[in-house]
């Protein structure tokens, strides 16, 4: 992806080795250029691997934290991804999984065929209880759960109703939402926190191996 989660981690951590994986050579090259500035600022080191998340070239039981954010809904055999994330995670360490929440995602599918048929887009909608059973199969212990980004639900539903086209209002809203994710803007945070429990765009699962 565009590396926003790596950037967010980089702002919060120091002296850490942060690894990103993407199957696109173009994306990896772009990220290598973008992250050179972050390396100097935070004394973090970054490594970018070209590869498939269903077969990760990282040693078993080697990672202190694994983040798999908004990935499982894109891949045909998502269980292979979960198994790989589990394999590389150190015992006792934490895995963060996030997927689109059922309600807002269902509305986007309902309102827009284009949303459903986007190349490389979402091919399934997860239900919370189903995913919890998948985690149990791997003996991952769920210790925290919440929903986030309710305002992103608003953005994507409005865009779905607009045949996936971005008008000026939606463009401005999206720019502000991205800034908010990095703490650079404050958009009705109180309202969003009130909406998150039932309308958050992402469901976040915190799991321990």
Question: Which positions does each model-derived feature cover?
Answer:
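A C-terminal cap/extension of S-adenosyl-L-methionine-dependent methyltransferases
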Residues: 44, 110, 147-209
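Short, hinge-like loop/turn segments at secondary-structure boundaries
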Residues: 36-38, 113-116, 160-164
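A conserved catalytic-core signature of glycosyltransferases
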Residues: 53, 121, 126, 200-202
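A SAM-dependent methyltransferase catalytic signature shared across enzymes that methylate proteins
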Residues: 129-146, 208
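Conserved SAM-binding loop
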Residues: 1-108, 130-132, 205-209
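Acceptor-substrate binding/catalytic loop of class I
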Residues: 113-130, 146-149
């Amino acid at each position: 992806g565009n590396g926003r989660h790596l950037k967010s981690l980089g702002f919060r951590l120091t002296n850490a080795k942060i690894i990103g994986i993407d199957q696109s050579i173009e994306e990896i090259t772009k990220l290598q250029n973008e992250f050179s500035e972050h390396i100097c600022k935070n004394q973090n080191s970054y490594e970018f691997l070209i590869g498939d998340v269903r077969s990760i070239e990282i040693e078993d039981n080697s990672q202190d934290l694994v983040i798999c954010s908004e990935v499982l809904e894109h891949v045909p055999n998502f269980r292979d991804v979960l198994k790989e994330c589990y394999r590389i995670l150190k015992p006792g360490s934490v895995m963060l999984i996030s997927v689109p929440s059922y309600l807002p995602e269902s509305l986007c599918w309902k309102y827009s065929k284009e949303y459903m048929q986007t190349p490389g887009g979402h091919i399934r909608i997860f239900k919370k209880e189903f995913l919890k059973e998948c985690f149990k199969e791997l003996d991952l212990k769920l210790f925290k759960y919440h929903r986030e980004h309710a305002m992103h639900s608003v953005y994507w539903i409005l865009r779905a109703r607009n045949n996936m086209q971005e008008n000026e209002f939606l463009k401005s809203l999206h720019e502000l939402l991205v800034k908010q994710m990095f703490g650079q803007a404050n958009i009705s945070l109180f309202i969003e926190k009130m909406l998150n429990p039932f309308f958050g765009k992402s469901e976040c699962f915190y799991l321990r191996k």
